Amino acid sequence: MKIPTKRISTLLFTLFLLSNHFTAISTAADSLGPKTRCFIEVGDPHISTFLQERRGIRAVKVDAESRCNFLQNNVILTVTIYKVGRFSDHFVKEFRTDPANPKSSGFRVKNWQTYRECMNEQETTYYGVAFSEAKINGKLLRTVKARSNKSKPLKCGT
């Protein structure tokens, strides 16, 4: 079957127009500015050896960091600890970094202050959730919530 030359010309012309159209869209999207590579890393719940050795406190702790390839300012990094319940999970503790603190700015901002003292040694499963809000290049940006990877039972009832 032979395709008429007019159809081939029309098809090629249409493809040419579409390729130019998508190139223009791609160029416009690239001109919006550099893309940030920011993310939250949430550590696994653990019994804090630091608190146990230095303060004599037995506590479950979750650490988190906000990392970005651009300078972050006035970061509020919120970390929440939950324990797994039979029918639903329960809030245990939440801590937010102070945006006015000089340590709340930089390429890497840490929140290692979220912990809850153990009341007994009952085996309990915990997990951490974190998100952050920061000023990057003058714009207020928020991350989606991130959850700790592993939840294992700890001998720490709250």
Regions found by a protein language model. Name each.
Residues 26-158:
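Mature extracytoplasmic or otherwise solvent-exposed domains
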Residues 11-20:
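Bacterial N-terminal signal peptides
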Residues 2-12:
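Bacterial N-terminal signal peptides that target proteins for export
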